[in-house]
Curated annotation (Swiss-Prot):
InterPro entries: Ribosomal_bS16, Ribosomal_bS16_CS, Ribosomal_bS16_dom_sf
Gene Ontology MF annotations: structural constituent of ribosome
Gene symbol of the encoding locus: rpsP
Family per similarity comment: Belongs to the bacterial ribosomal protein bS16 family.
Entry protein name: Small ribosomal subunit protein bS16
Top-level division of the source organism's lineage: Bacteria
Organism: Photobacterium profundum (strain SS9)
Assigned keywords, A-Z: Ribonucleoprotein, Ribosomal protein
Amino acid sequence: MVTIRLARHGAKKRPFYQIVVADSRCARDGRNIEKIGFFNPLAKGQEERLRLDLDRVNHWVGLGATVSDRTAKLIKDAAKAAA
């Protein structure tokens, strides 16, 4: 099954997440099908906190991809900011 979820990158105590489309059987930070955005929880000042390609999200959800809980909240936030 294909899922849209977060893959952790960054350094120790400084998380940075890629929002990826991946097979649910693959490891969290393992192989992915497509990178569709990023999330920086520690963004300060003018740094971008969230970037997400909503067209690609809709494409993958239309094909039957499931969305993780945290990613669903981020998609909702990105859609609100885009409107």
